[in-house]
Amino acid sequence: MLAMKRWIAPLLLPLIAQAEPCPDWPDSRAQVEFAALSQQIAQWDDAYHNQGRSPIADELYDQARERLQRWQQCFAPARQPLPEPLTGSAGPIAHPVPQTGLRKLNDAAIGEWIGSRDDLWIQPKVDGVAVTLVYRQGRLHQAISRGDGRHGQDWSARARQLPAVPTRLPEALDLVLQGELYWRLEDHLQARDGGAGARGKVAGMMARHELSDTDGAAIGLFVWDWPDGPASMDERLSQLQALGFADSQHYSKPIRSVEEARQWRQHWYRHRLPFASDGVVLRQGTRPAGARWQAEAPHWAVAWKYPASQALAVVQAVDFRIGRSGRITPVLRLQPVDLDDRRISRVALGSVPTWKSLDVRPGDQVAIRLAGLTIPRLDSVIWRSPHRAPVEVPRSADYHALSCWRSSPSCQHQFQARLAWLSSKQGLALSGVGPGTWSSLPLQGLLDWLELDKAQLQSLPGIGPRRAAQLQQAFAQARDRPLQQWLRALGAPPGFDAGGLDDWPSLIERQRDDWLRRPGVGPKGADRLLAFFSHPEVQRLGRQLQQAGVAGFQPQAGPPRS
């Protein structure tokens, strides 16, 4: 059935295959992993080329093939042929001129390619399905899908239902055109909207036996080459416009340098186009006659893709970050990937139930994209390793708002999170004190730092006299912070200051009814406040602050107030 343009992917060994480290696997596991990923890619190929479905984004598919190619280089048992993308995609109809592929060059290689050539032109790389149009005496004789580049399916009947494909030319010419059928889009910005599923829509329509008038009108045509047309690009474009293919001239621009190419690439990426595009195509105006073309990447044209919107990352481990309130957040530790000039090595999953529903394990490959252009997020699980590594999950019952006031192996995450909050702007606002500071101090309890003097600080690795003096000054300032600020820093529940604050001894004597009498404090809030102020560890911290001379923790004269 359908055969589209994904087959160009393996024509250039890309950065993943060159730079990604080899997995630390025994040969037996390497063979199993290679076979499993190879089978998955073959299934994607079949869905894409033969069923008209696109179960995975092109950029992720490319990265999966690149990774498989890297594994093939890494392990002797995996040195078997890579899956052939076009297996079974060839149709019964021979192309009069083979459909060539395109090498995809990265930013570094594109400058060298341009610098060694002249008579260059640039076009948007329209994201649709490729087609060959054959005209006899000016009438549409045949439309052929790309297939394997040599043979494709007969799309003639469906092509005649497309208003964008002229069934009769202004002149009685015999000619062969190659182009792209695309889904018409309004107000489409590639940088904002991505592919928008446009290619899959065209593929699905062309797989049907009948098209409605509405569906047919939604499909456009961009002719990107006339293999046996006039020798010069200018003349080819001029004649194509005269024949009714005006888009060819409108979207083909001469360039003289990589700077001009970059400008057009950015322009088409960030400005409105009537179609989706996944990069640009650079062509030499002069190229061999069509009789010499082959179904492989030519030397006279290359593709320069837009920046990837998704990266395919290998999960190295599943960690669990525990916040100061005891919330457990699964974090995938990734083999580092680059996305939009950012190096990404971790991505949070939100919650343990989310992780369990996804069942992500080490060795799996996941799609990562940037949310709001800054925060990496997991988009989907693309491929699961056949080796389902066990993952040790923290017990949710062990972590809550009143756990981990002291350092221990199982409490390290929450304990450090408490310290980070304590010194932050929301807490005591200690200048120059942050997570890095706390991790360098040998603390067993949350407030042990109050007892460290300058000499003790200076004796610690990485802390010199100047830094020790800075820390001592910050710690001294903490003693002067008011009670309200200290309670916020210790993590007191909301409502602790409702109706005004007494001293610490009065707060820890309050009962549930006392809290309920405070404005804005309901039953749940009263329960949380009572649990906090009556907790033995919290009361121990209060005594420690009393001994340190912090003002709000000293008893006031007179009877306590409720």
Swiss-Prot record:
It catalyses: NAD(+) + (deoxyribonucleotide)n-3'-hydroxyl + 5'-phospho-(deoxyribonucleotide)m = (deoxyribonucleotide)n+m + AMP + beta-nicotinamide D-nucleotide. It holds the Pfam family DNA_ligase_aden. Its EC number is 6.5.1.2. Transmembrane segments: none annotated. The active site is at 125 (n6-amp-lysine intermediate). GO terms for molecular function: DNA ligase (NAD+) activity. GO terms for biological process: DNA repair; DNA replication. Keywords: DNA damage, DNA repair, DNA replication, Ligase, NAD. InterPro entries: DNA_ligase_B, DNA_ligase_CS, DNAligase_adenylation, DNAligase_N, NA-bd_OB-fold, NAD_dep_DNA_ligaseB, NAD_DNA_ligase_OB, RuvA_2-like. Catalyzes the formation of phosphodiester linkages between 5'-phosphoryl and 3'-hydroxyl groups in double-stranded DNA using NAD as a coenzyme and as the energy source for the reaction. Belongs to the NAD-dependent DNA ligase family. LigB subfamily. This is DNA ligase B. It comes from Ectopseudomonas mendocina (strain ymp). The gene is ligB.
